[in-house]
């Protein structure tokens, strides 16, 4: 029994040693998150970029926090001396027990617009997963004053109400125009019908007049022809011996 137990313990220790050598046991893994976008105007005296991290299987020692900035010029390493004073351009605050750090940009100007990256590392751990950076926060400093959220919400609601009002006015105008155009259209149709009837009546009267005139002329010509024929007949009878 003792020999079997000792053998199992030795096998377990060998397995742990192998796993530790390949990094399966005690592997330190970090993940870092930070806001991807921040926008302020020149009236802000300072802006703070927050960074949170989570560590799994890492040593109990406190990690190191680093900040980088990528702007229009060369990338910069920020706050290598700590940046603990608010009189500095940048101020770093660390709450490592709560897994939180932050970078404050003081006396904000448009030149501070850049991408700020938070980095967390356990220097004693050689693995790459023990040194991670966030996705970066794009800071945009506007040279014009931005509207507050309350004012933007109010303006959005006002624009929506105006859109509804304008739509209602347009619909009412269209309906009113249609209602006014219908009587005029009916009147025009009626007048056109009366004009057509009047024209038809005039044409009929003209046709009747022409027919009557032609009929009278035909009768007169017929009577004239008959008289001529009778005169010729009488003359013929008179000339016979």
From Swiss-Prot:
<protein>
    <recommendedName>
        <fullName>Immunoglobulin superfamily member 6</fullName>
    </recommendedName>
</protein>
<dbReference type="InterPro" id="IPR007110">
    <property type="entry name" value="Ig-like_dom"/>
</dbReference>
<dbReference type="GO" id="GO:0005886">
    <property type="term" value="C:plasma membrane"/>
</dbReference>
<dbReference type="InterPro" id="IPR013783">
    <property type="entry name" value="Ig-like_fold"/>
</dbReference>
<feature type="disulfide bond">
    <location>
        <begin position="51"/>
        <end position="118"/>
    </location>
</feature>
<keyword id="KW-1015">Disulfide bond</keyword>
<dbReference type="InterPro" id="IPR039089">
    <property type="entry name" value="IGSF6"/>
</dbReference>
<keyword id="KW-1133">Transmembrane helix</keyword>
<feature type="signal peptide">
    <location>
        <begin position="1"/>
        <end position="27"/>
    </location>
</feature>
<feature type="transmembrane region" description="Helical">
    <location>
        <begin position="154"/>
        <end position="174"/>
    </location>
</feature>
<feature type="domain" description="Ig-like C2-type">
    <location>
        <begin position="30"/>
        <end position="134"/>
    </location>
</feature>
<dbReference type="GO" id="GO:0007166">
    <property type="term" value="P:cell surface receptor signaling pathway"/>
</dbReference>
<keyword id="KW-0812">Transmembrane</keyword>
<keyword id="KW-0472">Membrane</keyword>
<dbReference type="InterPro" id="IPR013106">
    <property type="entry name" value="Ig_V-set"/>
</dbReference>
<feature type="region of interest" description="Disordered">
    <location>
        <begin position="214"/>
        <end position="241"/>
    </location>
</feature>
<dbReference type="GO" id="GO:0006955">
    <property type="term" value="P:immune response"/>
</dbReference>
<dbReference type="GO" id="GO:0004888">
    <property type="term" value="F:transmembrane signaling receptor activity"/>
</dbReference>
<feature type="topological domain" description="Cytoplasmic">
    <location>
        <begin position="175"/>
        <end position="241"/>
    </location>
</feature>
<dbReference type="Pfam" id="PF07686">
    <property type="entry name" value="V-set"/>
</dbReference>
<feature type="topological domain" description="Extracellular">
    <location>
        <begin position="28"/>
        <end position="153"/>
    </location>
</feature>
<dbReference type="InterPro" id="IPR036179">
    <property type="entry name" value="Ig-like_dom_sf"/>
</dbReference>
<keyword id="KW-0393">Immunoglobulin domain</keyword>
<feature type="compositionally biased region" description="Basic and acidic residues">
    <location>
        <begin position="222"/>
        <end position="241"/>
    </location>
</feature>
<keyword id="KW-0732">Signal</keyword>
